[in-house]
């Protein structure tokens, strides 16, 4: 696990199983990539049919105009999610190219940031 003091030590796969059990009315799928173009392609693939997207773009949040543009181009509402509180970290992390096009941003609640975002989609 990368930097457990920041991100915790729990793997996402077991957490996803927990979320699927907790939110049975939602059809949850998971995609992870370290490749900017793959993230953009996935947004374009699902961004017109999914009911919602939770996007943790990691470091690309602060550097990728292209991912921000991809979020702007799709119709599906996107919630930007971060495990750590990006505003309590280095100043370069305070900039998001995604947030201006997102429905909202949830940051700093550990893996529970994902749970909080999913709760929004259950209350629509």
Task: Describe the residue ranges of each PLM region.
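Short catalytic helix/loop segments, enriched in acidic residues and glycine
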Residues: 3-22
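A generic structural motif
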Residues: 23-29
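Short beta->alpha junction loops
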Residues: 29-37
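Short, glycine-/small-residue-rich phosphate/pyrophosphate-handling segment
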Residues: 29-30, 79, 88-124
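Short acidic active-site motifs
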Residues: 38-42
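Short acidic/histidine-rich motifs immediately flanking catalytic phosphotransfer sites
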Residues: 46-53
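Short glycine-rich anion-binding loops that position phosphate/pyrophosphate groups of nucleotides
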Residues: 58-61, 84-86
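Short Gly/Thr/Asp-enriched flexible loops that form oxyanion-binding sites at enzyme active sites
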Residues: 64-75
